[in-house]
Amino acid sequence: MINNKVNVSLSKDLRKKYGIRRFPVAKGDIVKIISGSRKGEGGKVVDVDHKTMKVSIEGVTISKADGKQVPFFIDHSNISITKLDLSRNDRYERLREIAARKNLPPPEVPEETSNDTKESDENVTGADKEETNEIKEEDLNDNEDKNNDGSQEA
């Protein structure tokens, strides 16, 4: 039988923050290798093999005899999570439950903002915003005049 959870130890900062030592690893978490031949390397989790309890990390590869680069899977006991990906609601809720049980403050709500809105807000300066507001007001006044003209004829 395969256990669905591959628990990985948390970094010291996250242990203090969340009040737990281990948490299931998932795609998107940032991890660091703490022992083995690749000690010190780290990156974003790309894949979790639940059968062998090993984790593939972005940028950690091994070259085959023919020169191809393939993912290097690391045992879950040799890594620690340095940043949790809380974009999935079930993981965030689990941390909230743990915090409530241990009388700790709830974790911060994960930021779910799209890059499109950030870029559009950054490209518009204060002067541009004022100009667009003036244009909108003029359009509203023109529309009101048209509505008033049309109502007098009818």
From Swiss-Prot:
InterPro entries xrefs: KOW, Rib_uL2_dom2, Ribosomal_uL24_CS, Ribosomal_uL24_euk/arc, Ribosomal_uL24_KOW, Translation_prot_SH3-like_sf
Transmembrane annotation, as ranges: none
A GO CC term assigned to this protein in UniProt: large ribosomal subunit
Source superkingdom: Archaea
One example GO MF annotation: structural constituent of ribosome
Region entry Disordered, spans: 97-154
Pfam families reported in the protein's UniProt record: Ribosomal_L26
Biological processes annotated in GO: translation
Keywords per UniProt: Ribonucleoprotein, Ribosomal protein, RNA-binding, rRNA-binding
Subunit composition and interactions: Part of the 50S ribosomal subunit.
Function: One of two assembly initiator proteins, it binds directly to the 5'-end of the 23S rRNA, where it nucleates assembly of the 50S subunit. Located at the polypeptide exit tunnel on the outside of the subunit.
Family: Belongs to the universal ribosomal protein uL24 family.
Name this protein carries in UniProt: Large ribosomal subunit protein uL24
Native species: Picrophilus torridus (strain ATCC 700027 / DSM 9790 / JCM 10055 / NBRC 100828 / KAW 2/3)
